[in-house]
């Protein structure tokens, strides 16, 4: 206990200090970036680190000299990072085949995470996975759509069942089924896990493979219209702003991967690309989402799934002591100001709690414990990720816009982008439809399963 207490004291700021100089355990960025890199990954969230990891795993013919990969993250404390502020869910229940396939890939990856991300002489990785199906409820108006979506999920190999109101009540007697026409329930490869552990596992493994990382802000693109297939010549400098020294550090690179999450769209707008190269604009915006925590000793208990209500409200169990997490996305016209991560507690009282209590009567007596806010990297075009090369800057690749499911799809998305960079094509999963072309052609791939 004494050693544990000392460890905790070593990992938090001293009294009276600020969080500005504090770094999470295990996070030690290089003081300065290297002068050159084959690939610069902008964004050190879980998607960015997944890309970096897979680049090193797939470097193949470059293995003799090694592919030099640099990850640039402007906030090494991760205090505003979408990854660590997520509720950590993974599910197979999506409405787009590509998303289902990425979920299946990621579930397999997480199941064998120590084979993929284990580092010699370091403790085994425990992402604290809690297996529990997602439970989607549908009213009469949404029943046919849910049934069709479940058939698609089954066709893709997902284990999902449909439940009638009677079956739903038998399995989860604490649910009010009054307005429920049908429900879908995942039988495997669904649940939740610790986001920070996955992020740090990707980072530790990638750095053990030789990936560099620095704290800084990417400020300019290496504008060229064709990229060096050998990845050996790095003659196109980008600028990285170093907040500690207030200097700009040039980094010559061949390829840039934009994995900046909620700020991926703004990154393209702000960093000096000629006007024609910014068209069409990348439709990714930061959207603030609240997560509330509450205690209810008479709540659903251990049988609680990750429930998504007909109203859009969701909740899941948090441990085994009667605690729960939940939230709800607001309508478009009521989006909160994303300029900070303050929480509107009236939103819980006026919008979320009535919906929770209607579905689970015991939640009438819940007691709020806390709340936080995080960001979705929200794709306003179709709520799906954008993966692949820029149409006119072939050395610029995109991996952003997942609209809330980037964490769970990070193993698959990182592999996909790395395959494009190293091999010039998708190999593990065919994700061509998620490329930039759909933005230019104005052909959205709508995902109906965004929570």
Predicted regions and their residues:
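Extreme N-terminal leader/targeting segments of oxidoreductases
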Residues: 1-39, 57-67, 448
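Helical element adjacent to the flavin cofactor pocket in flavoenzyme catalytic cores
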Residues: 185-255, 259
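Glycine-rich FAD pyrophosphate-binding loop
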Residues: 56-83
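Central helical "cap/lid" subdomain
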Residues: 239-303, 345
